[in-house]
Amino acid sequence: MKKVFEYIATLLLLLAVGTSCEEGNDNWKVITAVPTGLYITGDATIYSAAATSSQLTTPAFDNAPEGTNIVGIYTWLKSSGSFTMLEVDSEGNEINYGSGESVATTPAPTYRLTVGGSPFTVAKDGLYYVAFNKADNQLTVIPTDFGIIGDATPQQWNDETAMAGALNEAQATVEYTIKDVTLDKKEMKFRYLHNWGVDIPYQGATVKMHSNMGAVAKGAISEAFSECKGGGDNFTLVKAGIH
């Protein structure tokens, strides 16, 4: 069967994880006067200091209650180092949070945050979603091993077909790719954790964050760049074959 090469995969997760400090590279800028907010710092990260790309922001929730006070970040973490969370208040005061007691282990480890606590670590290099629950002062560290799912893929809508993730330092991206996988001329999405959402402990219950990436608008995948968003529409493949 003739191989068909398309730019489907690359969920290219243009997550702007930012590894370059070249002048003019907006993916990575060291901040000298750190604005109010929450940041991830440490040698497990790809940031040498607080940076625009290391600030936590509101995630794509799946029907979470209005006012849910969780922020987070997709970021590459290294098993050889450690990280802490930096909070900067409106007066410029900085507070470093480390790990306290374990709150939950599934679907991902959740810890109570402690001022000056032990730094966090991960068992293997990879892309993670780090969620800071500001209401309960907790941190959830979620591995995001993306795959593809859908009737265009080998496992249909039953489960993900694994992709290989790698940090591209030169391009300041995390790239997920597949090779020699037969895909049909149908629909697919990107997903991790074998579920459509991940439950994050919150206020004695949980809130769900999308663990699937779809299209910003329904349409076919082409060889051009296609933007993804949490919980977005299905992508449509226009060519069947080995990808």
Residue positions per predicted region:
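Insoluble glucan recognition modules
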Residues: 2-10, 18-243
